[in-house]
């Protein structure tokens, strides 16, 4: 078996990736989220496949087909709620994974990091299109509002929006193409994940100290397979509690009303995992400015390697930057809360302050803190 594992053309790829992979001996549970994201992706693809067997992407029957899945299909309610809440678990793991990358300076592995940003955009696009498919009120109006943002692009904006809609409003053509894209994107994401792993295994994993760990590597299996499995148990426990006891807690009640183009909901808002970006979008009174801020709120991750001023890689031994980091985390919670609130005083001013703080901490305060720490430790 050992010979086959190391010699067989296919199995040896798996062997070098998950079995004999040299791994730092000191990586913590924050390194579990990569494998958990893989699990989330598998859950989403499998539940999505079974949902697609019963779903119809037609404006007249989409809402009814989802109701039919929940009422008449064997365990359809479970598959539907696993898929809906699986998206939430996916984003929780994603945010923690990215947060770990920022804290421990993993962005210095530039190819892996940039691939991760592309993956983040792809997952966000997939989740957005998936939210449109049940064709409830928030599905319809969310699709209308978010796609309409593209009209802010000078000269070609309006034409581009109508091209995406396939008409003069969000309608049957839009729903059909969103279903097609929502189906294909997870497979593209799977391919991108393999590239992400390929880049990661070129350099090897980072570790909490940020120091070179070549002198102290251990095989991935059994040490980290068992550690990942513990993470899987925790994730599945939380996931099934959420799905079986509180399936609708993260959803919007408006989405249980069929889409009606003649009736606008009082507060149009996306799913919780987009609220931080939505708050940044709304905090700028200008449409084009808001769209640019929205894109930059994620794209800013790409310039993190350029903003790294410290002589140390991680924040483990850097208390000043640590403080900035946790203020940034708190700021993201505030933005998430504001994104779900109506556009009125005092929420608007809180949102604007939090948006300015978000960009200021990343672009100005954290690099300055890095330089101060270099001086304190006399690393210059």
Swiss-Prot record:
The cofactor(s) it depends on are: heme b
SUPFAM superfamilies assigned to the protein according to its UniProt record, in alphabetical order: a domain/subunit of cytochrome bc1 complex (Ubiquinol-cytochrome c reductase), Transmembrane di-heme cytochromes
Name a GO molecular-function annotation.
Answer: metal ion binding
Gene3D superfamilies given in the database record: Cytochrome Bc1 Complex, Chain C
Superkingdom of origin: Eukaryota
Q: Which residues form a coiled coil?
A: none
What are the recorded Gene Ontology BP terms?
mitochondrial electron transport, ubiquinol to cytochrome c
- Asked whether the keyword Transmembrane helix is assigned, the reply is yes
The record gives the membrane topology as: Multi-pass membrane protein
Q: Which residues bind a ubiquinone?
A: 201
* InterPro entries assigned: Cyt_b/b6_C, Cyt_b/b6_C_sf, Cyt_b/b6_N, Cytb/b6-like_sf, Cytochrome_b, Cytochrome_b_C_euk/bac, Cytochrome_b_N_euk/bac, Di-haem_cyt_TM
Q: Where in the cell is it found?
A: Mitochondrion inner membrane
Ranges that cross the membrane = 33-53, 77-98, 113-133, 178-198, 226-246, 288-308, 320-340, 347-367
Q: Subunit composition?
A: The cytochrome bc1 complex contains 11 subunits: 3 respiratory subunits (MT-CYB, CYC1 and UQCRFS1), 2 core proteins (UQCRC1 and UQCRC2) and 6 low-molecular weight proteins (UQCRH/QCR6, UQCRB/QCR7, UQCRQ/QCR8, UQCR10/QCR9, UQCR11/QCR10 and a cleavage product of UQCRFS1). This cytochrome bc1 complex then forms a dimer.
Function as written in the Swiss-Prot or TrEMBL entry: Component of the ubiquinol-cytochrome c reductase complex (complex III or cytochrome b-c1 complex) that is part of the mitochondrial respiratory chain. The b-c1 complex mediates electron transfer from ubiquinol to cytochrome c. Contributes to the generation of a proton gradient across the mitochondrial membrane that is then used for ATP synthesis.
Anything else known: Heme 1 (or BL or b562) is low-potential and absorbs at about 562 nm, and heme 2 (or BH or b566) is high-potential and absorbs at about 566 nm.
Protein name per the record? Cytochrome b
Q: Which organism is it from?
A: Microtus oaxacensis (Tarabundi vole)
- Taxon lineage: Eukaryota, Metazoa, Chordata, Craniata, Vertebrata
């Amino acid at each position: 078996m050992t010979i086959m594992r190391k010699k067989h053309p296919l199995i040896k790829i798996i062997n070098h990736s998950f079995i004999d992979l040299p791994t730092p001996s000191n990586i913590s549970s924050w390194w579990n989220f990569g494998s958990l994201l893989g699990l989330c992706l598998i859950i989403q693809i499998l539940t999505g496949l079974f949902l697609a067997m019963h779903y119809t992407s037609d404006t007249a029957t989409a809402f009814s087909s989802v109701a039919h899945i929940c009422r008449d299909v064997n365990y359809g309610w479970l598959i539907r709620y696993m898929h809906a809440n699986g998206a939430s678990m996916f984003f929780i793991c994603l945010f923690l994974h990215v947060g770990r990358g920022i804290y421990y300076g993993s962005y210095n592995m530039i190819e892996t990091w940039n691939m991760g940003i592309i993956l983040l955009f792809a997952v966000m696009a997939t989740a957005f299109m998936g939210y449109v498919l049940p064709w409830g009120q928030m599905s319809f109006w969310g699709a209308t509002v978010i796609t309409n943002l593209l009209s802010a692009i000078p000269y070609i904006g309006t034409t581009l929006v109508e091209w995406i809609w396939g008409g003069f409003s969000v309608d049957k053509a839009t729903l059909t193409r969103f279903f097609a894209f929502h189906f294909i994107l997870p497979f593209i994401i799977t391919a991108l994940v393999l590239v992400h792993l390929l880049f990661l295994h070129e350099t090897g994993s980072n570790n909490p100290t940020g120091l070179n760990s070549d002198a102290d590597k251990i095989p991935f299996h059994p040490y980290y397979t068992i550690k990942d499995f513990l993470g899987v148990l925790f994730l599945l426990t939380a996931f099934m509690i959420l799905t079986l006891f509180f399936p609708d807690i993260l959803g919007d009640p408006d989405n249980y009303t069929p889409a009606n183009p003649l009736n606008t909901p009082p507060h149009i808002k996306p799913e919780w995992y987009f609220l931080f970006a939505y708050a940044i979008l709304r905090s700028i009174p200008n449409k084009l400015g808001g769209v640019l801020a929205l894109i930059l709120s994620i794209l800013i991750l790409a310039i993190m390697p350029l903003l790294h001023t410290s002589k140390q890689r991680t924040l483990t031994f850097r208390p000043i930057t640590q403080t900035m980091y946790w203020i940034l985390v708190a700021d993201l919670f505030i933005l998430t809360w504001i994104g779900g609130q109506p556009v009125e005083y005092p929420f608007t001013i809180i949102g604007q302050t939090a948006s300015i703080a978000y960009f200021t901490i990343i672009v100005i305060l954290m690099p300055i803190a890095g330089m101060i720490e270099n001086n304190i430790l006399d690393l210059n």
